[in-house]
Amino acid sequence: SYTNACGGKDMQTATVTPTKKPDMVDEGQFSALTDRKISRATATKYGVKCVHDLQGNVVKHLYPYYNGHELSATKYRNVKDKDFFVSGTYNDTGLFGQQLFKGGKYVTIVEGECDAMSAYELLGSKWAVVSIKRGAQGAVRDVKESLEFFEEFENVIIAFDNDKAGKEASIKVARLFKPSKAKILTLPHGYKGPNDMLRSN
């Protein structure tokens, strides 16, 4: 969900300042996402930074999105309430993590940034894992926009959330590929996504 940063009744007098395209993720630091049990090495690979409070607790994640190898947007997500906002735009970016991988035997698609990093760790940190940008409702659009990227892989594994929306989106996304290429991964009962599995270890 998006949060509304504006308030009050004088909306007609508000001045809208366009968000500048960031040159870099200019807040936070590379560290383990301790709230999600994701290692510093994985966070660093994906370019994810954290903001900490005075007690050293992770309070915000910063997820970078690239157009090719140029940073176009950063998603800021609060740990406590899970609200987020985006600096820049990811309308014409690749999927989360897409810039890190180029072809291979397997690529796994998941439904969120933390699930992407978690699946990467669960798979031994050696297989490509990317995340859609707009959740289950935007999965088909996101994957369609990156079909050229997926053509470079032999197998596409779809591992969306283990809920109704995720399962429905998995079927729709699988239909974008020839039947022998796309496979839907069903997570064990009790796990919504890869991060649940990582945290249970």
For each predicted feature, which ranges?
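Short, acidic/turn-prone active-site loops that include or flank metal/cofactor-
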Residues: I132-G138, N162, L187-G190
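Short, small/acidic-rich helices and loops at N termini and domain boundaries
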Residues: S1-K20, M24, D35-N57, R175-L176, ...
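Structural alpha-beta junctions
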Residues: S125-A128, R175-L185
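Short, highly selective alpha-helical patches that border small-molecule cofactor pockets
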Residues: S1, D115-A116, G166, S170-A174
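Phosphate-handling DNA/RNA-contact segment within nucleic-acid enzymes
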Residues: L54-E154, S170
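Acidic beta-strand-to-loop metal/phosphate-binding motif
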Residues: V107-I109, F153-A165, T186
